[in-house]
Amino acid sequence: DKVYKLQGAATCIDNSNGLIVAIVGGRKQKSITGYTLNRAYQSYRQPGSCFKPIAVYTPQLERGYTPDSIVDDTYFNGGPHNADGSYAGKISLRYAVEKSKNVIAWKLFQELTPEVGLSYPIKMGFANITDSDYYPAASLGGLTNGVTTVEMASAFATIENDGVFREPTCISKITDADGKTIVNNKNNRREKQVYKKNAARMMTSILQGVLVSGTARGNALDNMSCAGKTGTTSDKKDGWFCGYTPYYTTTVWVGYDNPKTISDLYGNTYPLRIWREFMSDIHQGLKNVEFKSYDGEK
């Protein structure tokens, strides 16, 4: 009859059609019956660094940056601190993403402008972007209201899908009393090109390194191509992992309903463990498929 205070939520999308195939709104409460909060689409939380590929890096990859572009990881007055307190100087954009360098995300977002950067999540239906979000802190996921796991899964699935957005839904088909199909979301989906194809493929290439040598190192799936991003808020009240394979995209959030610091909460602790266990399970028996290469990939 225990009531769990530490909560979580997750959303999984089938990348072949953009449909939501699994959703978890929280930990089961035996003592509670009837309607309960579904945190996967009803709770808006700060996404931390998981927001960087959506609003900063993929947009900049459309504008001439590449994984090999050199950027300057040097602290500057008025700028953010890197999570580990260290600064690496001249580094590649790939390395900056793998190590989740806040300084680089902040600089590139200012260069891009918040108006341009935030136009991307808005195109993908992020419902709670407000006027007060149009500041550099948004580059690090510092948003007024936050995001849901459904929104984040849809955005990362868009990157996997060569930049083409499909509105997330759990409804695959609706038929009437006579069996006539009224809605068929498997075959007739409205699509929107949000990111340029090559930029999305470059982003996927970079995010593969996160699981090999970055903030989620050592957690790549066995015998399956995968890419992803960790996210942790500065006060450790929200932890995320957003990742995908050519088959599925899954996002996981962990935290308290009433935000509270959790000393050992990082994107690469509880959220990543949940993501890896779930993704390993649903990929059993599936053949490894490589991600598509970007133009100029070595």
Please report, for each region that a protein language model flagged, where it lies by residue:
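Short, well-structured active-site flanking segments
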Residues: 33, 37, 51, 60-77, ...
